[in-house]
Amino acid sequence: MRWLVGWSSTAAGAAEIGSAGATGADGETVHPVGSQLLWGDPDPLWAVGDWRPDEVRVVTADAQTRIAVLGTCGATDEQLRVGLFAARGGALRHLTNWPGSYTAVVQVGRRVTVCGDLAGARPVFYTPWAGGTAYATAALPLADLIEANLDFGHLAALLAAPDVPAALHDSTPYDGVRRIPPGHALILRAGAREIAGYEPVASLAVAAPTADPDRAVDAVRDALVEAVRARLSAPRHVPGADIDPGPVPGMGPAERRAARGMPVPGIGADLSGGPASGTLALLAAGLPGMPGTVLGHGTGAGERLLAVTFNDLAVGGREGELERAGNLAANPRLHHVVVAGGEETLPYADLDGPLTDEPGASLVTAARHRARLASGSADHFTGYGARQVLDAHPARLADLLMDRKRRHLVRPVAALAKADGSVMVPARVYSAARRLSRTPYRTGLEVLADRLMDRRFDEPGGAVGASLAALTWARPGPAARWLTGEALAEVSVRLQGGTSRSGVGPGQRPGDYRARAALARHAADLRVLEQAAEIRFQRLHAPFLDNQVVRACRALPEALRVQPGARAAILRTVLQGAGVADLPPGWGAPSHASAAVAARTGLRVAADSLMALFGTPLLAEAGLVEARVVRKALRAAAEGEPLP
């Protein structure tokens, strides 16, 4: 786990020499354990954890003007210097325009600016401390710093309405630790703080400008290529090269590395058979430049990338994905590895993982991902986030109505009607989209607050039912039915408080708002996965969550997004533009069914351990859930009853 942590004091002068400005209430000097000081008094900044040398860059203009970039950033030192001068004048968006995934911190005199990303994969947290403000890219260290208690109101909101930003607001699981929203920056001036957005806000008074589909897809291609190239141009790393204990009889370097659980040197990628991971693997293998493989580590001639496919032996139904992955791996530039997993890699199989910064649904599948990533590379591409940035949230149908583009509803509604087999589907979907387009944001929150108070959680089933349920400003989460009345009442109060805050309303159309909320939740869950399934010396790369890729995807026309199969078609066009035209049959086929079957099977296999876990759950002791209700739902789900 890696993070940066800093501090902005209210003192006008520098603190005592050697304290780096961080002096506690009792006069003691506070230093993060295992930290690397990037700059000192009076507003110090540290990098904590196992950062690589090329992941921490500091560019200085003078003693009071400097920028630190932590993570993978494709900018040159000169570009960082230009961005520093732009940020000094207040143009924060320049700090987020470079390819890669990183956190930028700028110091200009006593003003410190910390930029979060657009997706939320690199969040920024802050808390008042010792008369100033402490900030970090992880919440748990700040909670430890101020000895914070758990925020049970946040946990209740996370269970009752996980997709509703108004319910969560800026809270975290730790009382007193706050989060800045995606697309914003934290600005500190001598301890005082301000949160400012750096993205332009579109007007809702007029229809959204019509974008050219071909140019928008070309922009997505360029952004993805630059994101992949930023990783390929970074130095190659040999994991654990300095901790090899030496020769072992009968074992070569590769065998010793495998025994220590080390990833393979170089760059690799997931190859699940889906379009997102396949696109990244083919781009990384085909771009000119240094290959991802490292000479002398067992790769054959011409192989430029390690591709890893997970084969679930405990659950069937993935034959089509495996066949597509095999066809893609026939590319001579790919070195293909298939990782087989049995019952020990099913969801819920191993919940005793590392302590993560926040709770998340990824904890359930951490062992499954860890088994796959253990055979991956030191730098490993994943397709996480592609669905969230490219697909159309059902609420985007309301956006089309607001822009008077009714004819573009025909194909998605026809696809839903075909899946449901009912002639009433078009009328129901159109009515729900029309109702949402005319419903104010405040009213949507009030409706959800009333639903929680009245415990109204029933929603229609099937694909059409899921789309109809999503055609709202806000909806309850599947775990809301297990919460106590007191917990639901507290979440309802939080929602009503959200409607009374100044400037209420997201300033976005409902579909765009729901899509951004879903992306933020997915990015936060990916963060949890990175920490729970972490392999030492390995870095996971999710280019679809890079700022420039997210921006390019947001510029795609709504009429293009809502078409059935749009994601696969866009990625096919991206590959064709990059020179890859030969794709296997079935490219872009959905794969939700196998994941659902695996989750159900894992739940059945781990039913006894889960029942023991919920024998005396901490959430029940805190008054958030009824343990009896949860155990009953677990037992029913293990026996095959439908899940909410």
Predicted regions and their residues:
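Conserved active-site loop/cleft motifs that coordinate metal ions or position small ligands
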Residues: I187, H380-F381, P644
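Short loop/turn hinge sites at secondary-structure boundaries
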Residues: A87-A91, L95, P162-P165, D403-H408, ...
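Cysteine-centered catalytic environments shared across enzyme families
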Residues: M1-E344, E358
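Short helix-capping/linker segments at secondary-structure and domain boundaries
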Residues: A75-E78, I146-L150, D379-H380, R561, ...
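Adenosyl-5′-phosphate
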Residues: S9, S35, V447-P644
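Actinobacteria-biased recognition of intrinsically disordered, low-complexity terminal regions
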Residues: M1-G34, G40, G240-G261, T293, ...
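ATP-dependent adenylate-handling active sites, centered on carboxylate activation for C-N bond formation
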Residues: R111-T113, A121-P123, A205-E486, A532, ...
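Proline- and acidic/polar-enriched loop/turn elements at helix boundaries
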Residues: P128, G341, Y384, W587-G588
